[in-house]
Regions:
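Single conserved hydrophobic/aromatic residue that forms the stacking wall/gate
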Residues: 1-7, 11, 211-212
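A structural signal for isolated positions on well-ordered beta-strands in alpha/beta enzyme cores
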Residues: 9, 40-42, 183-185
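Short, ordered loop/turn segments at secondary-structure junctions
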Residues: 13-15, 46, 77, 111, ...
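Buried hydrophobic positions in well-ordered alpha/beta secondary-structure cores of metabolic enzymes
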Residues: 14-17, 70, 128, 173
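Glycine-rich phosphate/diphosphate-binding loop of Rossmann-like nucleotide-binding domains
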Residues: 16-23, 151-212
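Short, polar/charged alpha-helical segment
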Residues: 21-32
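N-terminal beta-loop-helix "entrance" segment that forms/cooperates
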Residues: 37-58
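N-terminal glycine-rich phosphate/adenylate-binding segment common to multiple enzyme folds
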Residues: 51-148, 155-156
């Protein structure tokens, strides 16, 4: 932001969540102090603490509060230990991802000065992963779960790839590439997954033609 203040919603969660969020907010405050900015931190309880108080691990009201903030700091949690969804065990990161449509999982990788690396030229790249589709069973079905076991010895996972999802992740990938070294690699397995990865590759190539 270019303004002199910002607001951030902080979700501590449980386990090492408080430790993680404290370190994150310390870094945030230090960065803002350097540029003579301030931040208002709004803390929300989620996870098991929320489940005990509100019978849900993530209250819907929190999403509305997050809309008014400039960012969200999400602490860690052990959502695999939560009760079923119908008993209030919502995965906070999944709820946030779906509600705000956070489709791009942006992961920079860069070696630091003074640290040795086996790559002579160093590392400075960004991995752009589509975050709303694929094999994960919490995001590949409109209703129900995209995983099933027809027998006790057989498990099946359904993969969901759409033209919309493939196109927009390619678009943001090219946007980042244009602002950096103008190099982009689309990673796929279209030689085997001909329909699903084939559709992704088709979309990535279509987007590339608009950036020539």
């Amino acid at each position: 932001r270019t303004s002199s203040s910002a607001a951030s919603d902080v979700y501590k969660r449980q386990g090492i969540g408080p430790e993680i969020t404290k370190a994150s907010t310390d870094v945030l405050k230090a960065a803002l102090d350097k540029f003579n900015m301030s931040v208002e931190l709004i803390y929300e309880e989620i996870g098991f603490v929320s489940l005990k108080k509100h019978k849900t691990t993530f209250r819907k009201e929190i999403l509305k509060i997050g809309e008014k903030c400039d960012g969200i700091i999400l602490g860690t949690c052990s959502h695999n230990d939560y009760p079923p969804t119908n008993e209030g065990g919502l995965n906070p990161s999944g709820v946030i991802r779906k509600y705000y449509d956070l489709y791009a999982n942006v992961r920079p990788a860069k070696n630091r000065l003074g640290k040795s690396t086996k790559f002579p030229m160093g590392i400075d790249c960004i991995v752009m992963r589509e975050n709303t589709e694929g094999f994960y069973s919490d995001r590949n079905m409109y209703q129900g779960v995209g995983e099933l076991m027809p027998t006790k010895d057989c498990a099946i996972s359904i993969r969901n790839i759409t033209r919309k999802g493939s196109t927009r992740i390619a678009e943001i990938g090219f946007k980042y590439a244009q602002e950096r070294r103008k190099k982009l690699v689309a990673i796929h397995k279209a030689n085997v997954l001909r329909f699903s990865d084939g559709l992704f590759l088709e979309c990535a190539r279509a987007v590339s033609y608009t950036h020539l």
